[in-house]
Amino acid sequence: MRFQFKRRLSPRKRRHLRVRAKVFGTPERPRLNVFRSNKHIYAQIIDDTRGHTLVAASTLEKEVRERFPDPHPKIEEARIVGQVVGERALAKGITRVVFDRGGYKYHGRVKALADGARAAGLQF
């Protein structure tokens, strides 16, 4: 009776676990991870062999917020975050990444972030 109620993962978490089983970042080609909340979007470039975050950007940063046009829809915010993470990655010598959509559909803000990173010069 102790384990009568099985804890269930959300569908996004299950998809993310499936994706993470296949996507792995190396030093030559690290992983570009996306996390999307209702209000903000976050992007990290991660080297999974060492477990270190090499580059990060989010809509919470003042430097990123200053680039937002007025008014700024969330898709435009995501595109700018993608550009910033791409610029920071190129400054550190990272040109190729593996895109980890984090269990989200490749649509809307996630797609806009990926397009912004590609526009900045990242290849994936």
Curated annotation (Swiss-Prot):
Signal peptide: none annotated. GO terms for molecular function: 5S rRNA binding; structural constituent of ribosome. SUPFAM superfamilies: Translational machinery components. The keyword Protein biosynthesis does not apply. InterPro entries: Ribosomal_uL18_bac-type, Ribosomal_uL18_bac/euk. GO terms for biological process: translation. CDD domains: Ribosomal_L18_L5e. Pfam families: Ribosomal_L18p (PF00861). Part of the 50S ribosomal subunit; part of the 5S rRNA/L5/L18/L25 subcomplex. Contacts the 5S and 23S rRNAs. PANTHER family: 39S RIBOSOMAL PROTEIN L18, MITOCHONDRIAL, LARGE RIBOSOMAL SUBUNIT PROTEIN UL18M. This is one of the proteins that bind and probably mediate the attachment of the 5S RNA into the large ribosomal subunit, where it forms part of the central protuberance. This is Large ribosomal subunit protein uL18. It comes from Thermomicrobium roseum (strain ATCC 27502 / DSM 5159 / P-2).
